[in-house]
């Protein structure tokens, strides 16, 4: 059976196993267990056969509910081999949230682990007659299988299922490869459809920016139900590089793994990198790139990276663009602190005003993205798809600008814009001023309801370790640095900012804190 898809794309793992079967595909950091590409290919063939025996066919939606582990890696490649659509679900969600996502995703089978079995069973239960999936039909029970010995009778054991014969699926670039749910910062999470072409284009453009080679070893310590973690597995098979898998993030263990396994690359959110720098004197010299996304890279963190020669690559991306949109290399990141660099290969970014027209260099507006990494839309939600796209591409909802060097700067979400007394305030601008205070480590700025002005500016600040920071200190710092209407009228101090699993500030939680 040909490994090549009709229009030139390939089964990456099968091809890699044929080209370099003895190359190391995967290392489990906890015990140094290694898999060559031939080993992994054989294991994936068995997993694909077991999924087929449980009824998964080409085009079906395969749900996965587990944290990062070797079994998850096998499921990713097995889904691709079957031509099934991978649907990774966030293992940290509450049962009702999972049930809603399972209904939207129209799953054929949900695969779990021991720790998520109870949640998987709850999410798979038949829904009420007034509850429906994306096509409007009532949702019945979804079969559940576990990669671990199951505790419940309805749950099948994937390991004990006799594999069926599998013929590798022939797929085109326009076929869906995955559905990933957004983090929900704009309301109910939506299922982002990503095609095989999206994934391939993202992998290639990222390789150009990072200089990826088969000799790379990429530490995987992010959750694989987010694109930042999933992309490491998908790309490594294309590059022929090695995944060093750490199940569950621990800052000290991650730093140790980088040194022990000569890791050259790692994907992190800023909080994770900050904790790693706190936990160790120096990161190993083998490290060639630290892809930093999920939240802005603050100046304080960039300063620490420059001082300690950490090759940080601040990146801007989203699920809808299959991860990266723009990425700065270290020299650029240190010289222009706060930028996310230039758009990746094949990616076009246009900054537009409220009417959708392009603005001049240096002017602020919404970032609109076009290119082969951009999703064709949201599964089962044509209304959301239509609303997200315009003549120039995907409207990201992010506010930023392009400088005269072509670099992109991201300020905040468009809907986060505060309108106070008829004046527009961009939270990112205010937060940057707050972070300039020597005793402020981080800050989040939100709009709060105000009877007189419609909204007022609120700020939650995190002091530096050991610093004593008062509300008055913050207010005095803003005088002369911000126009009166931009200054925070409500200020709170906290040890940390509330964040989602992907590192994004939970703005509603900030508002709740400031309202108390």
Go through the PLM ranges and name each one.
Residues 34-38, 170, 175-204, 506:
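Conserved AMP-binding A3 loop
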Residues 342-346, 357-388, 425, 432:
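Conserved ATP/PPi-binding loop(s) of AMP-dependent carboxylate-activating enzymes
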Residues 4-6, 21-24, 129, 162-181, ...:
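Conserved pre-ATP/AMP-binding loop-to-beta segment of ANL
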Residues 5, 22-56, 60, 65-69, ...:
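Conserved AMP-binding/adenylate-forming core of the ANL superfamily
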Residues 115-174, 188:
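ANL superfamily adenylate-forming
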Residues 238, 263-268, 272-335, 348, ...:
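Gly/Ser/Thr-rich phosphate-binding loop
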Residues 200-217, 224-265, 275-280:
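Conserved AMP-binding/adenylation subdomain of ANL enzymes
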Residues 93, 371, 376-377, 387, ...:
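AMP-binding/adenylate-forming catalytic core of the ANL superfamily
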């Amino acid at each position: 059976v040909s490994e090549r898809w009709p229009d030139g794309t390939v089964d990456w793992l099968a091809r890699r196993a044929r080209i370099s079967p003895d190359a190391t595909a995967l290392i489990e950091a906890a015990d140094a267990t290694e898999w060559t590409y031939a080993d992994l290919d054989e294991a994936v063939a068995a997993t694909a056969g077991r999924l087929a025996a449980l009824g998964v066919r080409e085009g079906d939606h395969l749900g996965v509910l587990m944290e990062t582990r070797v079994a998850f890696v096998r499921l990713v490649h097995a889904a691709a081999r079957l031509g099934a659509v991978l649907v990774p679900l966030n293992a940290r969600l509450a049962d009702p949230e999972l049930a809603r996502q399972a209904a939207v995703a129209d799953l054929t089978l949900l695969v779990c682990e021991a720790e998520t079995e109870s949640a998987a069973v709850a999410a798979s239960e038949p829904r009420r007659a007034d509850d429906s999936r994306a096509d409007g039909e009532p949702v019945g029970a979804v079969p559940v299988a576990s990669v671990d010995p199951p505790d419940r009778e309805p749950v099948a054991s994937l390991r004990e299922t006799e594999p069926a014969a599998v013929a590798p699926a022939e797929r085109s670039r326009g076929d869906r490869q995955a559905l990933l749910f957004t983090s929900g910062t704009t309301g109910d999470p939506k299922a982002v459809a990503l095609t095989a072409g999206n994934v391939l284009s993202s992998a290639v453009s990222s390789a150009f920016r990072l200089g990826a080679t088969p000799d790379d070893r990429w530490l995987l310590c992010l959750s694989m139900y987010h694109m930042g973690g999933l992309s490491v597995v998908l790309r490594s098979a294309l590059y022929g590089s090695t995944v060093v898998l750490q199940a569950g993030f621990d800052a000290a263990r991650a730093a140790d793994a980088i040194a022990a396994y000569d890791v050259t690359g790692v994907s992190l959110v800023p909080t994770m990198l900050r904790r790693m720098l706190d936990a160790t004197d120096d990161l190993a010299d083998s490290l060639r790139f630290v892809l930093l996304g999920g939240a802005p890279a603050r100046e304080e963190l960039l300063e620490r990276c420059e001082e300690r020669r950490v090759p940080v690559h601040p990146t801007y991306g989203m699920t809808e663009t299959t991860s990266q949109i723009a990425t700065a290399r270290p020299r650029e990141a240190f010289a222009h602190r706060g930028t996310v660099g230039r758009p990746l290969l094949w990616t076009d970014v246009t900054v537009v005003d409220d009417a959708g027209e392009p603005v001049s260099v240096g002017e602020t507006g919404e970032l609109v993205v076009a290119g082969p990494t951009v999703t064709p839309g949201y599964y089962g939600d044509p209304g959301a798809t239509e609303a997200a796209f315009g003549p120039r591409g995907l409207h990201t909802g992010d506010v930023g600008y392009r400088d005269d060097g072509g670099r992109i700067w991201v300020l905040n979400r468009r809907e986060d814009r505060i309108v106070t007394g008829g004046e527009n305030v961009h939270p990112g601008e205010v937060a940057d001023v707050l972070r300039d205070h020597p005793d402020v480590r981080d800050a989040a700025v939100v709009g709060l309801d105000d009877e007189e002005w419609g909204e007022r500016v609120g700020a939650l600040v995190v002091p530096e370790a050991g610093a004593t920071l008062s509300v008055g200190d913050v207010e005095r710092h803003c005088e002369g640095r911000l126009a009166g209407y931009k200054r925070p009228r409500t200020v709170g101090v906290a040890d940390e900012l509330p964040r989602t699993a992907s590192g994004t500030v939970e703005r509603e939680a900030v508002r709740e804190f400031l309202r108390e």
